[in-house]
């Protein structure tokens, strides 16, 4: 699909790479996902791919973004207007929980914002909902503690390099070459040495362990607290706790976190 529609060339700095999106969508199809909740659409590159996927498969797409940059948000909404996507404006700590109240759809949760441990905690909390089948997060870079923590939650590889174990099918190879050319042409900040999107199949892992994951890095918003707030409708409390924690303790460090 990405090659057919020439979507590789539309990639912009900071977005999920084409092969990373292809890997995510393939895992969703294998798991029988019928709804994808995306948090963090930025300029809408990955959301556009999700929209094309929805057109072809009928999978429901919910895309959440804070939209603090109104001009950027307007451009993004205009580009995505032709796609069957529910565009939600709001805080992920509230809106992911609201989207998960639809219990009759096998769901994947993809987080590209917020970042860091807040995102990991949101994903782990999502696993407490039985309809959630796939958890995925972007910006899991080499050397980051979040990368290792997320990978350790799974009983199988979460990054495509190890999951595919050297697989080089025709379409995958052509997509990789198109991506390499793109990286060189645009002078991308990162290369293809290591993918930064992890994809975890909850059915092949320990759901209870994921939902109850614990770490001091979660600060005042661990997965169990988030899951409780979502199930009891205390969405605003989560937003308050996350914002207050960042005010009192400072925002999470990004590099090496």
Spans of features found by a protein language model:
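S-adenosylmethionine/decaboxylated-SAM
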Residues: 21-257
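Class I SAM-dependent methyltransferase Rossmann-like catalytic core
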Residues: 2-31
């Amino acid at each position: 699909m990405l090659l057919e529609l020439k979507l590789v060339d539309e990639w912009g700095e900071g977005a999920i790479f084409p092969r990373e999106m292809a890997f995510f969508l393939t895992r969703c199809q294998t798991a029988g996902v019928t709804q994808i909740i995306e948090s963090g659409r930025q300029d809408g590159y990955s959301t556009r791919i999700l929209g094309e996927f929805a057109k072809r498969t009928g999978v429901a797409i919910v895309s959440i973004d804070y939209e603090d940059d109104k001009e950027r948000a307007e451009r993004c909404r205009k580009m995505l207007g032709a796609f069957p996507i529910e565009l939600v404006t709001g805080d992920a700590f509230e809106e992911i929980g609201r989207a998960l109240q639809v219990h009759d759809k096998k769901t994947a949760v993809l987080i590209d914002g917020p970042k860091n441990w807040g995102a990991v905690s949101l994903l782990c909390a999502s696993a407490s909902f039985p309809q959630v089948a796939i958890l995925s997060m972007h910006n899991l870079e080499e050397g980051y503690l979040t990368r290792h923590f997320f990978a350790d939650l799974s009983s199988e590889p979460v990054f495509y390099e190890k999951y595919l174990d050297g697989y080089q099918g025709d379409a995958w190879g052509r997509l990789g070459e198109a991506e390499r050319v793109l990286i060189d042409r645009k002078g991308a900040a990162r290369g293809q040495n290591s993918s930064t999107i992890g994809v975890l199949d909850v059915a092949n892992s320990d759901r209870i362990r994921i939902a109850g994951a614990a770490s001091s890095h979660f600060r005042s918003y661990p997965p169990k607290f988030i899951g409780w707030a979502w199930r009891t409708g205390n969405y605003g409390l989560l937003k308050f706790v996350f914002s207050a924690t960042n005010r009192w303790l400072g925002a999470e460090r990004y590099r090496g976190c």
